[in-house]
């Protein structure tokens, strides 16, 4: 399966259901793949919304209180999280809707880093680091708690910018003896896991802009 598919919704359907609604729900919360025991029913909608239709595998029965922890810990180990989504006569029950809302809220902020992140050789004093598999000049620090500062080791050069992904709030940092010290301030909204971006020098930064 494509490594960019960090979460997969496994729809467990009984009775009638609107497949278009289900696939659109998956897309809207940041999932890039779905599965079902009735794949033929999902084929057209998946093509319509550019969602990958995976072969069905065993999934996890998760709740809003543990879904983000489970997703992040699996991603730390380069694993996708397959989440069982019960659908009864086309509807989600209250617990399932709360689960989906929790995923949506978190993925709305951090889905890009989460889907496209892979393990990084960098180390950090708290949390862990992923790097963008398509643009390795972007590193992502995942933090469960928010200390006053963190220290990142393994960078060759001082980065151009360090920021919370949420609202792109810049953070103060200093590089000395190969150690990047980042001073943290709490973001506007604190999630179960918070993510900051370390932006290194990019290839396009070498382009000289000429005005005519």
Where are these regions (language model features)?
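Mature catalytic domains of secreted/periplasmic carbohydrate-active enzymes
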Residues: 1-212
């Amino acid at each position: 399966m494509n490594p960019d598919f960090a979460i997969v919704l496994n729809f467990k359907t009984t009775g009638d259901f609107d497949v278009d609604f289900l696939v659109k729900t998956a897309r809207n919360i940041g999932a890039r793949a779905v599965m079902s025991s009735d794949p033929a029913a999902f084929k057209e909608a998946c093509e319509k919304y550019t969602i990958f239709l995976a072969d069905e595998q065993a999934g996890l029965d998760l709740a809003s209180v543990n879904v983000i922890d489970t997703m992040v810990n699996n991603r730390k180990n380069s694993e996708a999280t397959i989440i069982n989504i019960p659908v009864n006569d086309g509807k989600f029950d209250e617990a399932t809707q709360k689960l989906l809302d929790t995923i949506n809220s978190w993925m709305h902020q951090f889905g890009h880093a989460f889907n496209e992140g892979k393990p990084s050789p960098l180390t950090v004093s708290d949390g862990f680091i992923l790097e963008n598999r398509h643009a390795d000049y972007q590193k992502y620090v995942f933090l469960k708690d928010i200390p006053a500062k963190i220290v990142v080791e393994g960078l060759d050069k001082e980065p151009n910018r360090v920021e919370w992904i949420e609202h792109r709030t810049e953070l103060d940092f200093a590089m000395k003896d190969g150690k990047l010290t980042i001073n943290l301030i709490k973001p506007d909204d604190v999630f179960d896991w918070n993510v900051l971006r370390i932006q290194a020098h990019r290839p396009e930064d070498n382009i000289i802009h000429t005005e005519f």
